[in-house]
Amino acid sequence: MEPAFGEVNQLGGVFVNGRPLPNAIRLRIVELAQLGIRPCDISRQLRVSHGCVSKILARYNETGSILPGAIGGSKPRVTTPTVVKHIRTYKQRDPGIFAWEIRDRLLADGVCDKYNVPSVSSISRILRNKIGNLAQQGHYDSYKQHQPAPQPALPYNHIYSYPSPITAAAAKVPTPPGVPAIPGSVALPRTWPSSHSVTDILGIRSITDQGVSDSSPYHSPKVEEWSSLGRNNFSAAAPHAVNGLEKGALEQEAKYGQAPNGLPAVSSFVSASSMAPYPTPAQVSPYMTYSAAPSGYVAGHGWQHAGSTPLSPHNCDIPTSLAFKGMQAAREGSHSVAASAL
């Protein structure tokens, strides 16, 4: 008689989840298998899952029984409180003892016999779940006693420290003897101004970095000196070139400076030591006056053809209307044009 409650499997049979198959169906499965019917046919005929049929037949072939559950009954519980107490004692005496050593000692001390002694896996589980917490707590207490006081955490990275008024004051004021010096990286972080000035955008170095830059052969002015810097400070350079730049180019940049705006008045000049030298410009042929179309000028390559001359690198004749002038005359003409434009 089928139970009144249960679930329906894919074959249409009714089963109860978690309950063994009835003994009558088990016996019928074994009888059909002895008649030579395949397990898949038995599964479709009795509407029992194929896995259940295979499991029952495998158990019958091994043990000769069709009853569910363990044949010899369940194993009695071996991890009694007495055994756990002895295991804890062994672990406290020798914290580095292994599970198999505990098992051998239980047998040697007569706590257990060969029938009820716990397995190595059971002893490991007891050590991990019941005794491991106590051992870890003891190790933590001993470690906490020997642990030094924690160092105060830095508010930011000490390698790339932001300049601050406190660090600047500490750099100026000498430290009295007997008082430990406070490193600049432990100071409070910089309070950024509300207005975005040119000094903040360019990231001008503060006084705290002056000690690092003193070793360099170039002189870098302080923050207080930036407002007093002007065009006259750069007049002591060479008359023809300043750090690889021509004098005319510097004068043109000085004349066409940025227009004043609403930002705080900060000089836009940068010291020559902080500027990387510009690459040397390529030598250009002397200036020439021309009467042909502008499209006739093509920038020549550095190499020359085998049959060409320095004046005609592409082995072509230059029109007679192109009259070359000397370098000095061309420069004088360019200066006069620049003066008239101003």
From Swiss-Prot:
PANTHER family (alphabetical): PAIRED BOX PROTEIN PAX-6-RELATED-RELATED, PAIRED BOX PROTEIN PAX-9
Keywords: Developmental protein, DNA-binding, Nucleus, Paired box, Transcription, Transcription regulation
Chain residues forming the annotated DNA-binding region: 4-130
A Gene Ontology molecular function term of the record: DNA-binding transcription activator activity, RNA polymerase II-specific
Interaction with KDM5B, as annotated region: 168-189
GO BP annotations listed: cellular response to growth factor stimulus; endoderm development; face morphogenesis; negative regulation of DNA-templated transcription; odontogenesis; positive regulation of transcription by RNA polymerase II; regulation of odontogenesis; regulation of transcription by RNA polymerase II
Subunit organization: Interacts with KDM5B.
Region (PAI subdomain): 7-63
Known role: Transcription factor required for normal development of thymus, parathyroid glands, ultimobranchial bodies, teeth, skeletal elements of skull and larynx as well as distal limbs.
Entries under CDD domains matching the protein: PAX (cd00131)
GO cellular component, one term: nucleus
Record region (RED subdomain): 82-130
Localization per Swiss-Prot or TrEMBL: Nucleus
Protein name, entry field: Paired box protein Pax-9
Pfam families, A to Z: PAX
